Every structure is written in C-alpha cells, then in structure tokens.
Amino acid sequence: MMRKTLFATLLSVAIVSSPASALDRDGQHDFDFLAGTWKIHLKRLVADKWVEFDGVGLYRQIWDGRANINEFEAEGPSGHIEGLTLRTYDPKTHLWSLYWANSREGVLEPAQVGKFTDRQGEFYAQDKIDGRPVFIRYVWSKITQTSAHFEQSISEDGGKSWTANWVSDMTKTTDGDFAAPANNPAQSPSDEDGPHGFDALAGSWNYHLHRLNQRLAGSNVWTDFYGTGDCIPLWNGRANLDTLVVDSPSGKIEGLTLRLFDPKVRVWRLYWANAKDGLVDVPQIGQFHDGHGEFYAQDIQNDHSVLIRFDWTGLKSPSPHFEQAFSIDGGKSWEVNWITDQTRVAPHTN
C-alpha cells in the first residue's frame, strides 16, 4: 500500500537522523508538555519577507498520551487560519506521526514522522513545491512546562541544507477555554447534511459491536462485544474526533476516528487509526442525504482489491447505527462485517 511505502521512506529518514540510543526509547509521553491552552506568536515566510501574527491552540490527550490532537486558529496575513494536528505514536517503532489539516480543505496532509531526543523532536515528510521534490522538517525545541518553540523548514537538496518558513513561540495560558471562531456563519437546515452532519454524535457513548469472524470467506459466524467512547466536536462541528475502547475476545482495542468536512466539495473524510501501530488509514469519503451517510474507500484485504463502505443511520435517534461492508465486485454486492449500535451516556461538555 502507498501509505506503508511512504511511511517506510520517512521511517528511514527519521532513523538516519536519530542516535541509536533513541530508537529503543519509549516516547509515548513526549507531547504531554502540550496539555492545555496556548498563546502562539507566529512568523511566516511570505515572498522572502517574514510576516508576524498571533494565534491560540488547545491540546487534548488521547490513548493515555499515545496520541493527541491540537486545535489551532489565528488571524494570519491572508485571513483567518483554522487547523488541527493529529499526532499518533507507534509503540513498535517508537516513532510519532504528525498529521496537519486546514479547515478550508478538510484533508489530512501526509504524516511528518520522527521522534524526540534530549527534549528536541524532529519529524520529516516528503512533498512537492512547483513540481520539485522537497523534504519538510518539523522541529520542537526549548520545551518547558509553560513554553515551547516550533519551526518548519524545507530542504531542496535532500536534507543538506534547510530554510525555515514557519516559526512558532508558544506560551501556556490559563485565560480559559479555547474560543470558537467568531466568524462562523449561522447554521441552516442544509447544514445537517453538510458541515453539521455528525453533530448528534457529540458526547459519551456505550457501544454494542458485532463483528463477522471471517471476512470475504462466506462466513455467517458473528462475535458480539462491548465498548465505550467519546465524540468531541472540532471547528464548531465541521470536524470531530471519536475515541473508542473495546474489550474484544482477542484483547483490548483502542481506536479513533477523525472526521473532517471539506467545504469546497461538501464531502466528509473519515480517518481511522488503531493504537497498536498509530497509523492512519486511507479516508472514507462521502456525504449525507436526508440524514443517511455513506462513505467509501478502496483498499486491499486478503489479497483482494476491496471497496469499503461505511453506512451511518439514525444519528439523531437514541441509538445511532453504523455498518461497515466490503465489496469485491465494484459495489454490485456487499458483505457487512462490522455493526455498531450506540447508546448515549452523557452529552458533550467543553
């Protein structure tokens, strides 16, 4: 899969950049220092000139520190900036993957992969600028309990030299809750099938799950198990984060789903990650119609090219219903292999 190929490339960069002693280090709590709300002073390189502005960020911990999510907003030189960073930790490789998304597009960018050594974190990704291949580096440094420094740099010569184009100096604040953007438009009825399609999931839930024991094998044997989870709205509902903890017959399952709305094409992208490796799967992409959501992705399962469908119904009912199904004939027929029924425990509170 392309995701694994790219990750392997970035893994090699991170390993070359890290001392041997750092590769075996348990770094699952490296980002714990970010807990809370931050004031951020930013400098951005625009047409060879640095532009300065200010923003605010909120950090939330996931999986007891093995993942986290940052909301961020600022009034930049080109207008309002609203984004988030999802960070996930792989306990096998001891590496972090950092995924950025901007609310204008609702897409997770390719992961920056790396780790911390001596309180400094370096994370790398590959990209293209005007058709030219480049490396991108994130560096976290000067970390205390109340301050931190972040730089983004670009290299066009394979990492021999770097040019910084984004610098952030952060100071922890106790001014109160992270403020929602003041310029969000009022919600309209059509928003329920668009940017607010998942609003009803906000809060805490009990899960009753049914899993088909063997997929694409003609099986009709199912296993039932139970779990709990929480859904947190982000970007005033135009994104949200679901966390799930399940005690299954094969052991504990911890996962998350990050859902991002793309206002340009009015689709949702649903990203799943499992705590066992921290890797984010290819997104399920789709829409709501009259409260019914269908989301699709292509993947490989058991050497089959598989079309995957997520199906959401009854989101406003006391028990929202979810089904996952696979098709190996281009969507002509479907095999349902995962069913979830939810029961609300508590509404969302900030």
Segments (PLM) and residue ranges:
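Bacterial N-terminal signal peptides that target proteins for export
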Residues: M1-A8
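Bacterial N-terminal signal peptides
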Residues: A8-S17
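Hydrophobic small-molecule pocket/channel-lining residues, especially in calycin-type beta-barrels
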Residues: S21-N350
